[in-house]
């Protein structure tokens, strides 16, 4: 099977890219390991920020449904769910595994929107049942309707940690505290205000010291941190919890990009190793594009815009649309992307993308 574009990852970036490419005449295949398209959106019950034409005030699960319905209704898109991309080969093919077996699929271009994985912390007892990543807790509650426990310690005060803490309380689960290693809260003030109104304490310059329990989590010890993020002896506090939820960040998933020979670089502001790519989301390997968290950890709103830019660029590269039209539409999308990244909490992300931009310019001489 050969397609003009193969999209790996059926989350917000991948689906947006697939739609934009297909709407401009490209034959697309979308591959996702999950049975349901939507990626992280399927478990995001909170409302998005931004402006109305970019889903402001719409819940993530509804955005995911809209994208999924649009993709399934597009005749130029073939969807492979429950299918995992196992490897990239030099003949521009992917080895994929589906319920029907293992096969190869070939593409003229590729969009890798493979997302990210949660970062874990090292501490005594971190392998006990009851220690979860925040994404796993969201999946349990918002997809399967299962409460993870009765009492939670949240580690990390970024948007995910704050939002999941609020959702836990809505589900009737006690959140004993949110601990944050940094001297300030990492997420939006609106989310922090919501959890504080529920009486959940947010302790900055604190972290978990250890988890307690023999067969599962039965408690945790937290302590204060000094300016070098070292625990301060004598500041320990024991907390009665049966769940420890780690919302300590994400790191991009780039396995297939490494296999494809894409040039990668370490950018801490973007979460780790990311591909080097230009303003069209194309990597230094011609015909290989990237979008979403695989290109750098960011919000779903910006991931969708980056996916659209990539899909539009694929259509232009394959000669489906004239260059002048591509540049006009790309510039509009780029302006919207810049506006979404203009807030103070996006300063770290902007620094990361400036690093990527400088690398690209330097290599082009």
Predicted regions and their residues:
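Residues forming the flavin
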Residues: 1-365
């Amino acid at each position: 099977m050969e397609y003009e574009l193969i999209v790996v990852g059926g989350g917000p970036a991948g689906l947006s890219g697939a739609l934009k490419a297909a709407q401009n005449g490209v034959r697309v295949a979308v591959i996702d390991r999950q049975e349901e398209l939507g990626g992280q959106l399927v478990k995001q019950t909170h409302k998005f920020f931004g402006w109305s034409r970019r889903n402001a005030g719409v819940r993530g699960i509804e955005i995911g449904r809209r994208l999924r319905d649009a993709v399934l209704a597009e005749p130029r898109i073939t969807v492979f769910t429950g299918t995992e991309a196992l490897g990239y080969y030099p003949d521009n093919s992917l080895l994929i595994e589906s319920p029907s077996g293992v096969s190869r699929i070939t593409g003229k271009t590729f969009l890798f929107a493979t997302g990210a994985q949660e970062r874990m912390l090292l501490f005594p007892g971190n392998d006990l049942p009851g220690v979860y990543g925040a994404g796993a807790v969201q999946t349990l509650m918002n997809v399967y309707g299962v409460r993870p426990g009765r009492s939670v310690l949240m580690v990390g005060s970024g948007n995910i940690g704050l939002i999941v803490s609020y959702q836990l309380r809505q589900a009737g689960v006690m959140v004993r505290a949110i601990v944050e290693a940094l001297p300030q809260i990492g997420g939006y003030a609106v989310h922090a205000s919501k959890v504080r109104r529920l009486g959940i304490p947010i302790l900055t310059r604190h972290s978990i010291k250890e988890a307690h329990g023999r067969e599962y989590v039965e408690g945790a010890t937290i302590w204060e941190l000094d300016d070098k993020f070292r625990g301060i002896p004598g500041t320990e506090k024991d907390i009665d919890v049966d769940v420890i939820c780690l919302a300590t960040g994400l790191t991009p998933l780039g396995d297939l990009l490494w296999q494809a020979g894409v040039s990668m670089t370490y950018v801490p502001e973007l979460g780790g190793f990311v591909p080097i790519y230009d303003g069209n989301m194309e990597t230094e390997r011609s015909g290989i594009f990237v979008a979403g968290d695989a290109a750098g950890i960011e919000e779903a709103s910006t991931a969708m815009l980056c996916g659209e830019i990539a899909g539009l660029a694929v259509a232009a590269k394959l000669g489906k649309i004239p260059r002048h039209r591509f540049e006009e539409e790309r510039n509009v999308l780029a302006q919207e992307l810049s506006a979404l990244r203009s807030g103070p909490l996006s300063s770290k992300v902007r620094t990361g993308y400036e690093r990527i931009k400088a690398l690209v310019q330097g290599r082009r001489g």
